């Protein structure tokens, strides 16, 4: 990931909007499948089929060697969980599903955490707070503001609720390139970091943990889990900085 921040034109942002809307529609399509007894590979295969049927490409497949089309991160998995035929969803699980279709060369990147059956009280609170963190991070985006404003808004809310913010994985610039500048930490201090300018497009994707923020990478080289084995949740949108605020590009129709 380089340091050069590319400002997108209105036409390019429209392309990103089209990709983002398809990503949101894919999550809407997968949501009813998230039930006890289904495997993460079944979710992956349906996502791949649906993406192809809509004339798009699954960006994660083969990206730096990633073997599947989506990421499925269950319970203590923070991010980049690999779908597998033996990973069966159980009642009480939480699962983050992260999708990135490519439409006409542009990436639409978003994720949601779903409940599998009835969640525990702590899981329910964690997921609620994580979604609130995403909303607060987006609300902190203003032209002329700083990247640190985003992380500060997220971190203050998460920690006030007794949770922690993952440090090892951050949001990122995105367009025709999957991951590019700027990096968007989900922690930090308001007024710090690079200035937000109209035309910047990036993801905000807070990963919030029940316990410690520390992560451990598994031997597969992809799956990151919480160091203490406690729960982690995540929500993600791709956004554009506008002349007067912010636009979420990964909203459904």
Swiss-Prot record:
Pfam families: Peptidase_M24 (PF00557). The keyword Hydrolase applies. SUPFAM superfamilies: Creatinase/aminopeptidase. It catalyses: Release of N-terminal amino acids, preferentially methionine, from peptides and arylamides. A divalent metal cation 1 binds at residues 98, 109, 236. Keywords: Aminopeptidase, Hydrolase, Metal-binding, Protease. Coiled coil: none annotated. The keyword Protease applies. A divalent metal cation 2 binds at residues 109, 172, 205, 236. GO terms for molecular function: initiator methionyl aminopeptidase activity; metal ion binding; metalloaminopeptidase activity. Gene3D superfamilies: Creatinase/methionine aminopeptidase superfamily (3.90.230.10). Substrate binds at residues 80, 179. InterPro entries: Creatinase/aminopeptidase-like (IPR036005), Pept_M24 (IPR000994), Pept_M24_MAP (IPR001714), Pept_M24A_MAP1 (IPR002467). HAMAP family: MetAP_1 (MF_01974). Removes the N-terminal methionine from nascent proteins. The N-terminal methionine is often cleaved when the second residue in the primary sequence is small and uncharged (Met-Ala-, Cys, Gly, Pro, Ser, Thr, or Val). Requires deformylation of the N(alpha)-formylated initiator methionine before it can be hydrolyzed. Belongs to the peptidase M24A family. Methionine aminopeptidase type 1 subfamily. This is Methionine aminopeptidase A. It comes from Synechocystis sp. (strain ATCC 27184 / PCC 6803 / Kazusa).
